[in-house]
Amino acid sequence: MSDKIAAIATGRARTGIGILRLSGDGCIEAAGQVFRLNSGRPLSSLPDRKLSLGTLFDAQGRPVDHCMAFISRAPHSYTGEDTAEIQCHGSPAALTAGLEALFAAGFRQARPGEFTRRAFLNGQMDLTQAEAVIDLIDAETADAAANAAGQVAGAIRKKIDPIYDGWVDLCAHFHAVLDYPDEDIDPFTLSGYEASLTESSRQLTALLSSCRRGRMVQSGIRAVILGSPNAGKSSLLNRLSGFDRVIVTDIPGTTRDTVEQTVTLGRHLVRLVDTAGIRDTQDVIEKIGVDRSMEAAKDCDAALFVVDASKSLTDEDRRAMGAALEAPEAIAILNKQDLPGAIEPSDLPFAYIVPISCKDSTGFDLLEQAFDMLFPDNAPCDGSLLTNARQAGAILRAKKSVDSAVQSLRAGMTPDAVLVDLEAAMDALGEVTGRTMREDITNRIFERFCVGK
């Protein structure tokens, strides 16, 4: 038996529609004390998932809104329990009055993520699907939303479950060989088991290989802006942000620390990192900023090397250029195209060179095209991209353990030694979907949800 929970699923801000969400044993009958159908029939008489008109009452029995409601009976609901939703006008006062009436009718306030936690505990979804719900809510691009939607539908589970189930079969055979040595059981075939485990390791490697793109789709491409002082780095950040995110002056060394801003560039979510101008300086604070600029260049997906194209290259420009070229991807940005040029594109050893003017905003379409070429949309965002660090960590541990099992087989070790590694791999892989559940992990996951989800 589960107690009855209720929450405002749409928050308490003024909106066109506000939703009261309910779940738990007996919640449909109890909700009928607060929401009464216009037909006069009890709420429990409705068929599942049919919106019907009625009136919402407060705890004193006064009508507070004319709205709609529907019910879903267990197990065919989001949580796997009896559920109901009351869809009101988005008045914070009406929603609060309705929620207080529900409390008086025996409901309690739902905790953050409790609806989805119940869905997980009742077998309506696994942990990858639960985490994808958060990713879908947080998605800032169409690609991120599409990938999260695919994972809500079970894309990761469909890749993980066959591997896990295959390991279960292998473990069962190993145990049979060990526990019943005198029985007529298929012999321990070294080559067959090795091939099976090697193939599962390959599949895990393929899944892990999607992590980089998955992270960029979900969290954004980390692009570090590098250049000498007054090249136009902060002006570039401000132009792409659409507002004055950082201070811009003619004084060298104005930017002394890294400044981050997330922007949308075409179909790409980009986390821009503005940095201090790279130069030799005696100023202690500015020197720390320059050091951080060099460190940021080592931890990025792309470097944007900004240079004042109206002046010849300086030693400071070349130092910044060297740092940019060490990044996984790099774009040279010839700024100040509104002035006579002093640098030819052929002077720069970059595959992608974009002439722009931060003053009049010319050339920014070319920058978007450069990102399209560097980060092509050549892999489907259907849920197959691994975006979650927790899941990736568990898969990596599983792969290391299964690789160790393969090495044990090749070394001619006995089945019991192989079992140790294989069962460790199963424990790790089971954490991905929740088949091997740790309460501290699930608590951490569902604490990320808002109330009402």
Task: Kindly give the residue locations of the regions a language model identified.
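Switch I (G2) and immediately adjacent beta-strands of P-loop GTPase domains
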Residues: S52-V64, A69-R73, G253-T281, D299
